[in-house]
């Protein structure tokens, strides 16, 4: 049973825990499948300058693998930190501010990473 204030704030038992649980498992499975190719790409990039890195990242399959890994890992990070914040931050204003900061941080990391991969893969 939620109070009207809790409904407005969208905090409390929203019965979305199961979907968050499965989303986190889905992103974890995606990262498990993508980690070996990502490690291979990182090893290929060791010791290369920007031109060499752009040449390797210019390959469409490699860029796609890295982009998928970035999206999966930042989404996984967002969900995991949100669960920790919801469980352990008890002051409502601090909880709301922390969730907003978490969302902003994860979006910023994903955006910057995607931009970097796209810029390097385009050869600019």
Predicted regions and their residues:
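Membrane-embedded alpha-helical bundles that constitute the cytochrome b-like, heme-associated redox core
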Residues: 1-124
């Amino acid at each position: 049973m939620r109070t009207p204030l809790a409904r407005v704030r969208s905090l409390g038992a929203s019965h979305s825990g199961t979907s968050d649980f499965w989303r986190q498992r889905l992103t974890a499975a995606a990262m498990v499948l993508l980690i070996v190719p990502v490690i291979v790409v990182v090893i290929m990039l060791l010791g290369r300058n920007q031109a060499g890195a752009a040449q390797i990242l210019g390959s469409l399959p490699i860029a796609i693998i890295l982009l998928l890994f970035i999206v999966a890992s930042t989404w996984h990070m967002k969900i995991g930190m949100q669960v920790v914040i919801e469980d352990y931050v008890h002051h409502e204003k601090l909880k709301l501010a922390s969730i907003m900061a978490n969302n902003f941080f994860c979006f910023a990391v994903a955006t910057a990473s995607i931009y970097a991969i796209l810029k390097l893969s385009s050869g600019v």
